[in-house]
């Protein structure tokens, strides 16, 4: 039977400033840590990415034409404040006013993120969010944006606090490239959650119009053998690192006893301690019921085994299937040999994990209010067919269809899910894979910056029109 989605459902497309805009040093934009990190370590940079800085009218016209009625956009903090604080860059401000006006002209609702992996370099060098001064600067920047852009009705503080701590201090594939430092991982998570809570409280106290929330990446963690206590414990600990610690801070305003026991165990094995103040708990508590929505980014699930050894992670950046290794001291190891399809980058395709994660939020955090699936999609080595000027991306259509089906199931089972944003609207630059890995509804020829709708774009258009998942 064909499943349907609600009449008022948002069928969106997602982007991010650094991955889409290009123009990394145009019109007074300040540097971000990624600029230097890519120059020093990789064979690609985010210049010109998808040239969204100049081509946004084209992408928004395509959005309107293909039934995309919501877009995730992030403001580049360093376009507004090149150093993260102090002097405002008027050209950056003007750009976002023009961009939001174009969104409204095309009837595409902008869902605007304040921070999407791109702390200004000046602040990043000084410890990023491990330095509590960055919290203050972020809140000042947030307040400036709330005042300056009343045309925005949906705000998100951060995109993926979990993967920021994970990428910067655990896997080491984000600048500053530190590995296996659990103290920094949890402190980064916590400090960013304090910054989130302060910004949300300020938004509500200031009486700004619209809604505010946060976007969390929530990969579901399962024990490889549910009857093996070591595997069960490994899944619980891995879930605390990636999901529970951050969800507790968001909706409980504190960390549950089980969460803190898990954190203390991980830190006792690996070294380090957390610095959490009474004021931190007070602000987390003050904000816990003020989030209007939760954005869930979901791509994959993981299966965990018990593990008694040192930490070792090998990140698959090449798309050669089978190149991943992930084992953490005192936590567990990911088992890749499971009967689940996976992408060329070893991401486990498991739609049931999205259903389970949504229902977990509904059950454990009943004050969640509503959910948007803010990212979900398939990274693929798309083959452009020159004669047809398109891509036959049936695998992407199938991936999205499967995930929308479980979203429909979750709604039927009582979850308040209000929209879905495919990652990504058009092909964009990928943080650790450059330009090889494509996700978009619209194919971007990065040489000419021309856009070509893929087969998935036509499928998505029909979906948005009929609300039927075919």
UniProtKB/Swiss-Prot annotation:
Keyword Ribosomal protein found: no
Keywords: Glycosidase, Hydrolase
Organism annotation: Staphylococcus aureus (strain JH9)
Any one GO MF annotation of this record: 6-phospho-beta-galactosidase activity
Record's GO cellular component terms: cytosol
Pathway involvement of the protein, from the record: Carbohydrate metabolism; lactose degradation; D-galactose 6-phosphate and beta-D-glucose from lactose 6-phosphate: step 1/1
Entry binding sites for D-galactose 6-phosphate: 19, 116, 159-160, 297, 430-431, 437, 439
Pfam families reported for this sequence: Glyco_hydro_1
Reaction(s) catalysed (UniProt annotation): a 6-phospho-beta-D-galactoside + H2O = D-galactose 6-phosphate + an alcohol
EC number, as in UniProt: 3.2.1.85
Gene: lacG
Family matches, as PANTHER family: GLYCOSYL HYDROLASE (PTHR10353), LP05116P (PTHR10353:SF36)
Gene3D superfamilies attached to this UniProt entry: Glycosidases
UniProt record, GO biological process: lactose catabolic process via tagatose-6-phosphate
Family: Belongs to the glycosyl hydrolase 1 family.
Active site (UniProt): 160 (proton donor), 375 (nucleophile)
Organism placement in taxonomy: Bacteria, Bacillati, Bacillota, Bacilli, Bacillales
Name assigned to this protein: 6-phospho-beta-galactosidase
Keyword Hydrolase among record annotations: yes
Xref: SUPFAM superfamilies: (Trans)glycosidases (SSF51445)
């Amino acid at each position: 039977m064909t499943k349907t989605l609600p009449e008022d459902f948002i069928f969106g497309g997602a982007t991010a400033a650094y991955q889409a805009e290009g123009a990394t040093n145009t019109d007074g934009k300040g540097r971000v840590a990624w600029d230097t990190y890519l120059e020093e370590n990789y064979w690609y940079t985010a210049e010109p990415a998808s040239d969204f800085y100049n081509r946004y009218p084209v992408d928004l016209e395509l959005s309107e034409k293909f039934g995309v009625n919501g877009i995730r956009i992030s403001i580049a903090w360093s376009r507004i404040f090149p150093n993260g604080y102090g002097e405002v860059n008027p050209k950056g401000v003007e750009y976002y006013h023009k961009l939001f006006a174009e969104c409204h002209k095309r009837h595409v609702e902008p869902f605007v993120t304040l921070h999407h992996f791109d702390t200004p370099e000046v602040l990043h060098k000084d410890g990023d969010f491990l330095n509590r001064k960055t919290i203050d600067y972020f809140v000042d920047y947030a307040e400036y944006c709330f005042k300056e852009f009343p045309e925005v009705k949906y705000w998100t503080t951060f995109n993926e606090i979990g993967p920021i701590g994970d990428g910067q201090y655990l896997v080491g594939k984000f600048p500053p490239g530190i590995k296996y430092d659990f103290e920094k991982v949890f402190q980064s998570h916590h400090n960013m959650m304090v910054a989130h809570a302060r910004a949300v409280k300020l938004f509500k106290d200031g009486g700004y119009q619209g809604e505010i929330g946060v976007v969390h990446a929530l990969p579901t963690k399962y024990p490889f053998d549910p009857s093996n206590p070591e595997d069960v414990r490994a899944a619980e600990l891995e879930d605390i690192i990636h999901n529970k610690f951050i969800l507790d801070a968001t909706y409980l305003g504190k960390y549950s006893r089980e969460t803190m026991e898990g954190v203390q165990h991980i830190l006792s094995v690996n070294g380090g301690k957390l610095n959490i103040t009474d004021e931190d708990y007070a602000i987390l508590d003050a904000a816990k019921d003020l989030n209007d929505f939760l954005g869930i980014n979901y791509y994959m699930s993981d299966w965990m085994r018990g593990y008694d050894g040192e930490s070792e992670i090998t990140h698959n950046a090449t798309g050669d299937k089978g190149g991943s290794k992930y084992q953490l001291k005192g936590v567990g190891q990911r088992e890749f040999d499971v009967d689940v399809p996976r992408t060329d980058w070893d991401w486990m395709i498991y739609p049931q994990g999205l259903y389970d994660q949504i229902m977990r939020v509904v059950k454990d955090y009943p004050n969640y209010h509503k959910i948007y699936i803010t990212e979900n999609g398939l990274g693929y080595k798309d083959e452009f067919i020159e004669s047809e000027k398109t891509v036959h991306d049936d695998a992407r259509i199938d991936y999205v269809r499967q995930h929308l089906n479980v979203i429909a199931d979750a709604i039927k089972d009582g979850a308040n899910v209000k929209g879905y944003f495919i990652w990504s609207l058009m092909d964009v630059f990928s943080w650790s894979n450059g330009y090889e890995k494509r996700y978009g509804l619209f194919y971007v020829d990065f040489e000419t910056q021309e856009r070509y709708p893929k087969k998935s774009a036509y499928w998505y258009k029909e979906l948005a029109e009929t609300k039927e998942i075919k």
